[in-house]
């Protein structure tokens, strides 16, 4: 692999699969994340949980809440609170666009995945709208129907 391709590789650390089940994803955006030293080491080891995490725009800045980063085993006194609020790094125009979305009723910001890109830890943030119970049932029924069709086609082609 060439040096150029090696730098553009993306290594996914954690994904929020529940987000696709609970929300309609409208738009995604890549954001940097402000971490402490031992948090970076812990993230690189994959000790991250995105379940129930969300982001909020406050005073022209975006913060990520409820993201759990397990304390680094060898970090001793340098470890920080695993559930602390973390600042996301975005351009001002991106923050303004996200703030406009979030002010609309029903929209929220949720992290979809954390990955390493060119040595930097990034978060894929989504503007999402919550699904109602009947929407979830509808999605499950549609997925089951597609699965049934694939099975029948496979049977037919044998």
Curated annotation (Swiss-Prot):
Keywords in alphabetical order: Cytoplasm, RNA-binding
Gene Ontology CC annotations of this record: cytosol
GO biological process: trans-translation
Short name of any one Pfam family annotated for the protein: SmpB
Molecular function terms from GO: RNA binding
Compartment(s): Cytoplasm
SUPFAM superfamilies to which the protein is assigned, alphabetical: Small protein B (SmpB)
PROSITE patterns, per database record: SSRP
Keyword Amino-acid biosynthesis: no
Source species, domain of life: Bacteria
Family indicated by similarity: Belongs to the SmpB family.
Protein purpose: Required for rescue of stalled ribosomes mediated by trans-translation. Binds to transfer-messenger RNA (tmRNA), required for stable association of tmRNA with ribosomes. tmRNA and SmpB together mimic tRNA shape, replacing the anticodon stem-loop with SmpB. tmRNA is encoded by the ssrA gene; the 2 termini fold to resemble tRNA(Ala) and it encodes a 'tag peptide', a short internal open reading frame. During trans-translation Ala-aminoacylated tmRNA acts like a tRNA, entering the A-site of stalled ribosomes, displacing the stalled mRNA.
UniProt-recorded name of the protein: SsrA-binding protein
């Amino acid at each position: 692999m060439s040096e150029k391709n090696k730098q553009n590789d993306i290594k996914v650390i954690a994904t929020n699969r529940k987000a696709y089940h609970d929300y309609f994803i409208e738009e995604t955006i890549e954001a940097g994340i402000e971490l402490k030293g031992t948090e970076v080491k812990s993230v690189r080891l994959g000790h991250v949980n995105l379940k129930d995490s969300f982001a909020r725009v406050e005073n022209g800045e975006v913060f990520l809440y409820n993201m759990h980063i397990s304390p680094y085993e060898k970090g001793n006194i340098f470890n920080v609170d695993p559930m602390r609020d973390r600042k996301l790094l975005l351009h001002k125009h991106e923050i303004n666009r996200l703030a406009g979305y979030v002010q609309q009723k029903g929209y929220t910001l949720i992290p979809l995945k954390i990955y390493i890109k060119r040595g930097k830890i990034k978060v894929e943030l989504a503007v999402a709208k919550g699904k109602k119970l009947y929407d979830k049932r509808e999605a499950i029924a549609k997925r089951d129907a597609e699965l049934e069709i694939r099975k029948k086609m496979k049977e037919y082609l044998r």
